[in-house]
Amino acid sequence: MDNPNIAIEVVYALADRQKLLRLSVPVGTTVREAALRSGMQQFFPELDLHHAPLGIFGKAVAKPEERVLEEGERVEIYRPLIADPKEVRKQRAAKAKTREEGEEPA
């Protein structure tokens, strides 16, 4: 008997555009294999699918080379963080404090 396939999706998004691809892959395909099979690099040549962080339905997958996909799952290709989230929060808090200090009662 042939090895059956499962239907999955692979997605990648930038601030200004995104792409969702529907694939049929063999049972036993890992998260990393699905990303590599997707052909997403056709649309985003800068992507390094061999090393990009990956997730399923908004949750990062620690070992995408080992995690086997199930029917209907959506593989998400994550972009690297541009700024450290802690630093961004500090900057936002400092800005808010400066604004508050500037608003003196009349």
UniProtKB/Swiss-Prot annotation:
SUPFAM superfamilies: MoaD/ThiS. It comes from the Bacteria. Transmembrane segments: none annotated. Pfam families: Ub-RnfH (PF03658). InterPro entries: Mopterin_synth/thiamin_S_b (IPR016155), RnfH (IPR005346), RnfH_sf (IPR037021). Disulfide bonds: none annotated. Belongs to the UPF0125 (RnfH) family. This is Protein RnfH. The lineage of its organism: Bacteria, Pseudomonadati, Pseudomonadota, Gammaproteobacteria, Pseudomonadales.
